[in-house]
Curated annotation (Swiss-Prot):
Its main location: secreted. GO terms for biological process: protein secretion by the type III secretion system. GO terms for cellular component: extracellular region; host cell; host cell membrane; membrane. Effector proteins function to alter host cell physiology and promote bacterial survival in host tissues. Does not appear to be required for the formation or the maintenance of either Salmonella-containing vacuole (SCV) or the Salmonella-induced filaments (Sifs). Not required for intracellular replication in phagocytic cells. Keywords: Host membrane, Membrane, Repeat, Secreted, Virulence. It comes from the Bacteria. The keyword Membrane applies. This is Secreted effector protein PipB. The keyword Secreted applies.
């Protein structure tokens, strides 16, 4: 069930549409333990499982609003997120300290009448879900079933993002394969490690963006403005760069010869250090295009 309007209310409706059940099930789901389990599932899977989720509209409404004002660095430095009066409970989200051998974990505490239940979730997956909620709200993005992919990427697969303005956004580690970015503003955007396989990037503005290690396999970049873009170690297999502006771009460790077309491309002042050709039979790197 896609979200057609990414307001907090509609995000909630989407997340909780499957919820039905008895009074006993509702009581269990909205107990401190039930609320805690819902948060763990949500921040682990980027979605929810079928278990009376319609009772949590208030939770996501407050969470989405809170996240609009949360700074990642401040949160990881010790600032906490509080959600008050969720079925009589107070929820506290905080980042625990990293140990020598493990990354930090996000601690979820649910308190009611002086009793507290706690659990932990992976900090990277937690913040990716937060990033996705913020992007959906800010840019009114129509979203498929899961906020993040099975690999932990922000899930923008096949999404229509045409004519939007993402200037200066952090879009690192997104999976936007087969997405439509036509005439979108992506200048000064962080696209490090982004999966843009088979994406339509016709006439986009990518000036000054960081696309290090981005996967542009079979992407349509015709007439795009990529002046000053950092494409270090990016994958351009089968990409169409016809009439693309690449002046001043950093093209180190890439194989331009694998691009589908460079006709009319402007490479003035670009820095190109070629790399040995990869194995283009490897379909994990070079999947077949979907048209």
């Amino acid at each position: 069930m896609p979200i057609t309007n990414a307001s907090p209310e509609n995000i909630l409706r989407y997340l909780h549409a499957a919820g039905t059940g008895t009074k006993e099930a509702m009581k269990s789901a909205t107990s401190p333990r039930g609320i805690l389990e819902w948060f763990v599932n949500f921040f682990t899977c980027g979605g929810v499982r079928r278990s009376n989720e319609r009772w949590f509209r208030e939770v996501i409404g407050k969470l989405t609003t809170s996240l609009l004002y949360v700074n990642k660095n401040a949160f990881f430095d010790g600032n906490k997120i509080f959600l008050e009066d969720v079925n009589g409970c107070t929820i506290c989200l905080s980042c625990g300290a990293a140990s020598e051998n493990t990354d930090p974990m996000v601690i979820i505490e649910v308190n009611k009448n002086g009793k507290t239940v706690t659990d932990k979730v992976d900090s990277e997956r937690f913040w990716n879900v937060c990033r996705m909620l913020k992007l959906m709200s800010k840019h009114n993005i129509q979203q498929p079933d899961s906020l993040i992919t099975e690999d932990g990427f922000l899930n923008l697969r096949g999404v229509n993002l045409a004519h939007k303005d993402f200037q200066g956004e952090d879009l690192s580690k997104i999976d936007a394969s087969n997405a439509d970015f036509r005439e979108t503003t992506l200048s000064n955007v962080n696209l490090v490690g982004a999966n843009l396989c088979c994406a339509n990037l016709h006439a986009v503005n990518l000036m000054g963006s960081n696309m290090t290690k981005a996967n542009l396999t079979h992407a349509d970049l015709t007439c795009a403005n990529m002046s000053g873009v950092n494409l270090t170690a990016a994958i351009l297999f089968g990409s169409d760069l016809t009439d693309t502006k690449l002046n001043g771009a950093k093209l180190d460790k890439i194989a331009l010869t694998l691009a589908k077309a460079l006709t009319g491309a402007d490479l003035t002042g670009s820095q190109h250090t070629p790399t040995p050709l990869p194995d283009y039979n490897d379909r994990t790197l070079f999947p077949h295009p979907i048209f």
